[in-house]
């Protein structure tokens, strides 16, 4: 395990899903102190602070608490930030050895929020009053993202998609979007996601699906500090049968993009791992959020190894708003080395292939799956 880790410790990083502020990267922001660097915007840590009894004014309040060389030190070669379709994308580009690219995240638009649709119409110079106009606006913004280096989309979902209801039914639902029932919203969402999946496939993009989250469960806290502040939890068991029907519909017409699946509830991972055998363009994503602990990462690796193929894993990502989170890659590589080393020691994996397996999971698989033009240096 020690030797395997040593051989991947210095590999470059491909962070294909994060929430960093691209402007802070572009301007090479110098943080005034360690507190802001480590805690600023990172609701994972805010949650832990509350559990330890820290007063809210020290977390999201105004109480007082040098990113400069972090990306270079950790050898970060690729960062995919998470961006709203109306974002101007002014700060993405190549900075030193690091490529910073946008990710298309249309959650606000697919929620049919009136303000979001107005913003989308303005950004795309298109009337979004009809389903046809809404789709055109999404495609115009998607192409704008692709022109700025976008290779990936991302969708955070409160419920899983199912079969496509068809254009006629979707147009009727969209026309009365402000009065839809929960089931009708699910129908329309499934149609829109299928439409976008077609567009992603045509543009050779990767589609990420995040699900299993129950957001903003503390109403009083949400009213005080807003969303993404540490008041989200894990949902119970997710109905992956719906997801299977959705992916099958895409695959049947040759429109399934390369897809990464993330469930916040780890009990879904075995089902997702077997799903990748039925739909080889899909991958189980990294252990996410509450699960990227030592036990959670190890459990995810073992589950993928048992039910799918460990050698197809896309490795680690930060999914973070904090530059300090790049330490997670070393954490992951140590756990992976221990896991693979144990397999070798037990005679379950050939020693001659272990180093290649480590390098593929830590770097090569993500580069190949995302079809990035990166050279290992």
Outline where the language-model segments fall.
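Mid-to-C-terminal alpha-helical segments outside catalytic/metal-binding sites
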Residues: 1-12, 37-63, 310-311, 328-377
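N-terminal hydrophobic targeting/anchoring segments and the immediately downstream early-domain regions
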Residues: 1-8, 16, 20-121
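Histidine/acidic residue-rich metal-binding segments in metalloenzymes
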Residues: 3-5, 65-72, 88-99, 119-258, ...
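Histidine-centered catalytic micro-motifs
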Residues: 13-25, 206-215
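Divalent metal-coordination and catalytic microenvironments
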Residues: 17, 79, 153, 210, ...
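Short acidic/histidine-rich active-site segments
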Residues: 23, 208-212, 260-262, 284-287, ...
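Active-site-proximal loop/turn and secondary-structure-junction residues that shape catalytic pockets
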Residues: 85, 106-108, 157-159, 213-217, ...
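C-terminal helical cap
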Residues: 264-267, 284-302, 350-370
């Amino acid at each position: 395990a020690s030797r395997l880790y040593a051989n991947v410790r210095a590999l470059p990083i491909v962070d294909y899903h994060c929430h960093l502020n691209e402007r802070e990267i572009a301007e090479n922001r110098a943080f005034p102190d360690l507190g802001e660097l480590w805690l600023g915007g990172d609701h994972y840590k805010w949650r832990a602070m509350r559990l330890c009894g820290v007063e809210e004014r020290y977390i999201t309040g105004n109480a007082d608490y040098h990113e400069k060389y972090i990306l270079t030190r950790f050898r970060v070669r690729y960062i995919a930030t998470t961006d709203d379709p109306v974002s101007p994308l002014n700060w993405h580009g190549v900075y030193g050895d690091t490529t910073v690219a946008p990710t298309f995240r249309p959650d606000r638009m697919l929620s049919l929020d009136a303000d979001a649709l107005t913003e989308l119409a303005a950004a795309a110079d298109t009337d979004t009053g009809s389903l046809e106009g809404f789709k055109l606006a999404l495609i115009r913004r998607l192409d704008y993202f692709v022109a700025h280096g976008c290779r990936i989309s991302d969708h955070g979902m409160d419920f899983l998609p199912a079969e496509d209801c068809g254009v006629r039914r979707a147009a009727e639902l969209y026309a009365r979007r402000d009065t839809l029932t929960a089931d009708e919203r699910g129908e329309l969402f499934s149609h829109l996601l299928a439409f976008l999946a077609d567009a992603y496939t045509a543009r050779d993009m990767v589609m990420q699906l995040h699900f299993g989250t129950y957001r903003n469960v503390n109403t009083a806290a949400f009213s005080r500090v807003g969303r993404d502040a540490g008041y989200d939890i894990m949902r119970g068991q997710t109905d992956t049968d719906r997801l299977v029907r959705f992916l099958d519909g895409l695959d049947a017409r040759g429109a399934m993009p390369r897809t990464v699946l993330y469930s916040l509830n780890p009990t879904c991972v075995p089902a997702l791992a077997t799903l990748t055998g039925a739909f080889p363009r899909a991958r189980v994503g990294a252990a996410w959020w509450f699960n990227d602990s030592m036990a959670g990462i190890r459990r995810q690796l073992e589950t993928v190894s048992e039910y799918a193929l460990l050698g197809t894993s896309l490795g680690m990502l930060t999914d973070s708003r904090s530059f300090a989170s790049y330490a997670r890659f070393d954490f992951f590589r140590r756990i992976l080395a221990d896991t693979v080393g144990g397999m070798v020691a037990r005679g379950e994996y050939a020693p001659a292939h272990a180093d290649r397996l480590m390098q593929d999971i830590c770097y090569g698989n993500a580069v190949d799956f995302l079809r990035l033009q990166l050279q290992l240096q």
